[in-house]
Design a protein with these regions (language model features):
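Conserved tyrosine-mediated DNA breakage-rejoining catalytic core shared by Y-recombinases
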Residues: 120-121, 143, 148, 152-186
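Short, basic (Lys/Arg/His-rich) helix/loop patches that form interaction surfaces
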Residues: 127, 143, 176, 190-195, ...
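Basic, Lys/Arg- and aromatic-enriched nucleic-acid-binding interface segment
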Residues: 72, 76-78, 91, 95-147, ...
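Basic/aromatic-enriched alpha-helical hairpins
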Residues: 12-70, 85-90
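N-terminal helical hairpins
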Residues: 1-9, 24-25
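Hydrophobic (often cysteine-bearing) scaffold residues that line and stabilize catalytic clefts
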Residues: 11, 33, 37, 74, ...
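Catalytic-site neighborhood detector that most strongly recognizes the C-terminal catalytic loop/helix
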Residues: 165-170, 183, 251-281
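Short, polar N-cap/turn motifs at the start of nucleic acid-interacting alpha helices
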Residues: 156-160, 242-263, 285-288
Length: 288
């Protein structure tokens, strides 16, 4: 209340000032650093109009705790944004205390949580497979890639496989054959865009994934997320008796203490292909 007549900046205004300050001319931060902040900010809509100085640590904590649909990685990005904004706000003398230092992430690692698409939901997806957004959902559901891995994948249309992956040692540089039923979808996207996902994953989730599932009335309960496509692939592997070790290999799961498999389990592309092709798509063969 040093100058009561001066309007105190809101969360949105501090964010905008922070971006200008952080990414000022002459700074050499990467595009992906900036994208992380932008992505985190899109989740904070309910804070936009609050006076930044008046925010309490308990409010920020409650806000993070409420974000049930978000993966731990996204929460980490949001908290990192809070920390950076407070760093700027201290510098600009907007606040005298960094409230975000008291906030923590209470979420568990959620890699294993999720709900595969049911047979009924898959049937509906295949029935509408002429839609490009649905094609991407099917690509992920029949290959097991995470949404965050798509844009960096090497796609070999001639030899019909994907190569790439992030996250873990076992997950990096893994090879997954392209299932014949999704090959044309993959080819169309790569030919048109050179990549499977030509937008950031937050945009995709908000403006493509959720709306199309709503339109088809298969949003699911709990609500399906793009990560559920990965769980769908895992479930399909189990349903069609894909070898357990090959399922792990294609999903990039580690073999834990099973050293023999990790070291001697080198599988050729063709061996993996014969496993992934055990997965049938009865919805389509019946229609044709």
């Amino acid at each position: 209340s040093k100058h009561p007549e001066i309007k105190k900046p809101t969360f949105r205004e501090v964010y905008e000032q922070f971006l200008k300050w952080k990414f000022a001319e002459g700074t050499n931060y990467s595009e992906s650093t900036r994208n992380n902040y932008t992505a985190a900010y899109t989740y904070c809509a309910e804070l936009y109009d609050k006076i930044f100085e008046d925010l309490k640590a308990t409010e920020l904590q409650n806000f993070l705790d409420k974000q049930k649909g978000l993966k731990k990685g996204s929460l980490v990005k949001i908290l990192s944004l809070f920390n950076q904004m407070y760093k700027y706000a201290m510098f600009a003398e907007i606040v005298t205390e960094r409230k975000s230092q008291y906030v923590r992430i209470n979420a568990v690692d959620d890699e294993e949580h999720g709900t595969p698409f049911t047979e009924h939901e898959l049937r509906i997806l295949w029935k509408n497979a002429n839609n490009p957004d649905i094609q991407l959902i099917l690509i992920m559901s029949y290959s097991g890639w995470r949404i965050g891995e798509l844009s960096g994948l090497e796609v070999n249309l001639k030899e019909k496989y994907f190569k790439g992956g992030i996250k873990t040692q076992a997950g990096k540089g893994r090879i997954v054959p392209i299932h014949p039923m999704i090959y044309d979808f993959v080819k169309t996207r790569i030919t048109a865009d050179g990549t499977l996902l030509n937008m950031n994953k937050v945009t995709y989730r908000m403006f493509r994934f959720y709306p199309i599932l709503e339109k088809l009335e298969i949003s699911g309960s709990p609500k399906h997320t793009p990560h559920d496509c990965r769980h769908t692939f895992s479930a399909l592997c189990e349903k069609y008796s894909v070898r357990e070790n090959d399922r792990k290999r294609m999903l990039g799961h580690s073999f834990g203490s099973d050293i023999t498999n990790a070291v001697y389990g080198h599988r050729t592309l063709e061996e993996l292909r014969s496993e992934i092709e055990k997965i049938k798509v009865p919805f389509v063969t019946n229609c044709d």
